[in-house]
Amino acid sequence: MKNILFVFGTRPEVIKLAPVILELKKYPEKYNVIVCNTEQQKELSNQTLAYFGLKADINLDCMKPNQSLLEVQTRILTALDKVFDNNKVDATIVQGDTMTVLCGALASFYRKIPVYHVEAGLRSYDIYEPFPEEVMRQMTSRVAELNFAPTEKNRQALLKENISDDKIFVVGNTVIDALFCLSEETLNSAKEY
């Protein structure tokens, strides 16, 4: 059995990783799914998990008022280090380009644990736009063992960065899969917003 750690902290990350989490949970004989929320967006991420009938196994509560980017990064990396101390992890899955994504990728890389990057290959090629996300997604793709690109254009961007073709898979955008995971009741209640 493989122990798969999902690391996220924002609502968009939950939405785009929920279908992958739910799919792997269908195979408990193959995968032990560990769901870790850094709570970068505490209320929004936990509320969104509930829409999918999910709960985090580990809540890190890393956010404090008025933190600098360096302070956020330090808190998340330190908290994830403890997660790895307390859990055997065979692979880490992250999505997108947030501080949580970069920290999940780096913490795994430092322990030689494979990183799988969902929504890889999005690029502006301007390190200050979006800031700091452009650098975060480039660094995450660089250390990822597998990169799941939404489109062929994203695959081409990764190839231009000398990421090996056998580490890139064009899979579409998991936000579409997320729609199919939600109940009709949940979708109808969302119309109120």
Give each language-model segment a name:
Residues 117-131, 145:
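A short, histidine- and acid-enriched strand-loop-helix "catalytic/donor-clamping" loop
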